[in-house]
Swiss-Prot record:
Origin species: Escherichia coli (strain MS 115-1)
Residues that bind Mg(2+): D72, D74
Quaternary structure and interacting proteins, as annotated: Forms complexes with Cap7 with 1:1 and 2:2 stoichimetry, and a 1:1:6 CdnC:Cap7:Cap6 complex.
A GO-annotated cellular component: membrane
Protein name: Cyclic AMP-AMP-AMP synthase
Taxonomy of the source species: Bacteria, Pseudomonadati, Pseudomonadota, Gammaproteobacteria, Enterobacterales
Sequence similarity: Belongs to the CD-NTase family. A01 subfamily.
Enzyme class, spelled out: transferase
Gene that encodes the chain: cdnC
Residues given in the record as ATP binding sites: K63, D74, H162, K185, K201, S202, F203, N270
Amino acid sequence: MSTEHVDHKTIARFAEDKVNLPKVKADDFREQAKRLQNKLEGYLSDHPDFSLKRMIPSGSLAKGTALRSLNDIDVAVYISGSDAPQDLRGLLDYLADRLRKAFPNFSPDQVKPQTYSVTVSFRGSGLDVDIVPVLYSGLPDWRGHLISQEDGSFLETSIPLHLDFIKARKRAAPKHFAQVVRLAKYWARLMKQERPNFRFKSFMIELILAKLLDNGVDFSNYPEALQAFFSYLVSTELRERIVFEDNYPASKIGTLSDLVQIIDPVNPVNNVARLYTQSNVDAIIDAAMDAGDAIDAAFYAPTKQLTVTYWQKVFGSSFQG
C-alpha cells in the first residue's frame, strides 16, 4: 500500500480548496447570526414576558462541519407559553409574527414561513437564516420539542447537548474529526447528485464517524480514515446499532424493529435512521463499496494520473491531486 501520489496532505489541501467553508465566509455567517441573537436578547430585556426565549445557532455552521456550498444558516428559537400553537402551520405563522415584532426593522417579506422553518433574509448579503421553532417548557439543558422534517412529529431535543456531543469528538481529534466529517459529507453530496436513489443524512454520517472515533479509529490520516468509514458501511451493512452514552445509559433504549438503528445521543427514543428502507441501505452500501474499492485501487496505482482518476471516483472531477 502506498500514498506516494496522493497522501494525507493532498486530501487536506483538496479539503481546504474545494470542500471546506472558507473561514472568512464562516465568520461572516456567524456574525450575521449573532446580530439576530443580539436583537432578540435586546428585545427580551425590554419585554421579559415575550414568548421567544432564546436563539441558538445549530446545524453544520455551529458544529464546524459546514461545506463550501453552504448558503444559509440554521438557528433554533425556543418558544415558551401556553398560547403557542401545537400544529406545524400554526406554529410557523406564530413564530414569523413574533420574529417580526422582535425585528421591527425587517420588512414583512424578509420574514417568511417555509415548510419546517421561518426564513429571515438579509438583503445586503443575500444570506438566509432558517429559524426552526423549539417548544420549550423549562426543562434542564434547554430540552424542548422540535418538529421532525421527516414526518412532522414532535421530537425532544437539546441543541446545547448536541453541540456538546460534537465538541467532545472535536476535542478527541482536534481538527481531524470535523475535517473527516466534511469530506464524508462532500462525498455523500456528490452521490446524491449522481445517484437518484441515494440519501444519507448528514446527522447519520456524523454519528457513524463519532462511533468510529470512539472505537479508536485514527482520524489524523484522511485517506485511511475515509477507508475505515466506507469499510464500516460495507461490512456492517448498517445493521449494527449505534448508541452513545454521553447523556443516558444504553439500557434506556428499548427493543426496535427498525432496519437501521442510529440513536440520537440526546434522545434515546429517537432513531434518526428509522425511515431508511432496504433500498436506501443498498444504495449507501453500493456507493460506499465503490468508494472503498477506488481508494484501495488508488493505494496501489503505479502512476499519479491513475491515482487521481481513482480518487475522482470518490470526490468527483474537482479533485485534481
